[in-house]
Regions:
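Short, surface-exposed, charged/polar-biased interaction segments
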Residues: 33-37, 48, 71-74, 118-121
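Alpha-helical rod/repeat scaffolding segments in eukaryotic adaptors/tethers
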Residues: 2-5, 29-40, 83-87
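Amphipathic alpha-helical coiled-coil segments
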Residues: 48-64, 96-111
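Compositionally biased, intrinsically disordered low-complexity regions enriched
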Residues: 57, 67, 82-84
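Short amphipathic alpha-helical heptad-repeat segments
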Residues: 8-27, 43-46, 60-77, 90
Length: 122
């Protein structure tokens, strides 16, 4: 699937660094959350996605980084509609990837197409 990415590798790395910092702050604030363990696990899952994509952005083109993010997104099990305490890590990774897609200006149609290919969790 061909994607058009207008951001440079440096812009992608800067944006991901910002997102990683937010996730780190969330990890540090988790103790004050209503459900501290869930909040921390969600933030850790997001942070790991941002770290993975940042590492890729060091050596790969912006298009390759987006393609990898789309591949990761497609491989996630579909857990939308499950209760809030279930599948925290999957929901955190999904949230991180969707934030990344917004950051790079991915066409919503592309994200929806990939999302429709995801398998439901069994």
């Amino acid at each position: 699937m061909e994607v058009n990415v207008v951001l440079s590798s440096e812009e992608i790395k800067r944006g991901l660094k910002h997102y990683r910092r937010i996730a780190k702050q969330d990890i540090l604030l988790a103790a004050d959350a209503e459900k501290p363990d869930d909040f921390r696990r969600h933030a850790e899952a997001r942070r790991s996605v941002y770290a993975h994509l940042s590492q890729l952005a060091e050596t790969r083109s912006p298009q390759e980084v987006v393609q990898e993010a789309l591949r990761c997104y497609q491989e996630l099990p579909f857990v939308t509609g499950t209760s809030s305490g279930e599948h925290i890590e999957v929901k955190g990774r999904e949230n991180a990837l969707e934030n990344f897609f917004l950051m790079v200006g991915l066409e919503p149609k592309v994200r929806r197409e990939v999302r429709s290919q995801r398998q439901a969790l069994r």
